[in-house]
Amino acid sequence: MIQIYTAKDIQNLTKNYRKEGKTIGFVPTMGFLHEGHMSLVEKARKDNDIVVMSIFVNPMQFGPGEDYEAYPRDIERDRQLAAGSGVDVLFTPEPEEMYGQEPTVTASVKKRTDVLCGRSREGHFDGVATVLTKLFNLTSPTRVYFGMKDAQQVAVVDGLINDFFMDIELIPVETKREEDGLAKSSRNVNLRAEERQEATALYRALQRGAELIRNGERDPEAVKREIRSILEKTSGVIDYADIYSYPDLEIRDPLTGKVIIAVAVQFSKARLIDNIIVDIPADQKEDL
């Protein structure tokens, strides 16, 4: 595995790969790798000649009072995991390399960001779109891989690629979970022991919501009430428990088509998110 630190070096390397006719699968991460990241690498390894991973804790996507400094980092551990999982090129730039002293141009996301995480994290997805535009330009990917745990991010990336006519294929990958259903996340290490047990309520609540919809419930408010009743039994503070169309993230009442049930709960030192996608069959829509 090659480790690269500068924009110039990664751009030159990946351009040469593409000139040689090789396909590149790109896995952008913020590090502190876990099995969820490894599942992205595994998929990228199967699909492409070259796998490039970036590890960059992007300061632009952290708002005031958020956990940029506290975000877990262990680059040596990550380097070993990346090498062992089949990554060919690891790109680990410093913030100064990506942004210089002060950015001249940044991205502004106009849709799909005023709900869910975007509602309480002003500017977050502008930061995501800005850094991904830079990383896509640097790594020349054929395909990019994102976990569906961050489904709103996947929706934003879908818009970014389509709106800017990027010749990149977006590959969403199913959320990787612990045995008890908790979505794997770098932030899970910040949970206290009792919070770790309580955190399983997120997936239970989502499963219950999906069950209601599959059994014919089409009132989003009724589904949200049931989800909240489960989450309220934890010590965490509910940020949101919502249902929208997917990937457009618009209100749909009654519920039809593909919808996302998404939750976010703030525990003492960790904000956890999770979601389930439910595809309502056309014949069920007609019965409404």
Swiss-Prot record:
Keywords: ATP-binding, Cytoplasm, Ligase, Nucleotide-binding, Pantothenate biosynthesis. GO terms for cellular component: cytosol. Its EC number is 6.3.2.1. Its main location: cytoplasm. One of its GO terms (biological process) is pantothenate biosynthetic process. The keyword Ligase applies. It is an enzyme of class 6 (ligase). Beta-alanine binds at Q61. ATP binds at residues 30-37, 147-150, 184-187. (R)-pantoate binds at Q61, Q153. One of its GO terms (molecular function) is pantoate-beta-alanine ligase activity. It catalyses: (R)-pantoate + beta-alanine + ATP = (R)-pantothenate + AMP + diphosphate + H(+). The keyword GTP-binding does not apply. Pathway: Cofactor biosynthesis; (R)-pantothenate biosynthesis; (R)-pantothenate from (R)-pantoate and beta-alanine: step 1/1. It comes from the Bacteria. Pfam families: Pantoate_ligase. InterPro entries: Cyt_trans-like, Pantoate_ligase, Pantoate_ligase_C, Rossmann-like_a/b/a_fold. It is found in: Cytoplasm. The active site is at H37 (proton donor). Homodimer. Catalyzes the condensation of pantoate with beta-alanine in an ATP-dependent reaction via a pantoyl-adenylate intermediate. The reaction proceeds by a bi uni uni bi ping pong mechanism. Belongs to the pantothenate synthetase family. This is Pantothenate synthetase. The gene is panC.
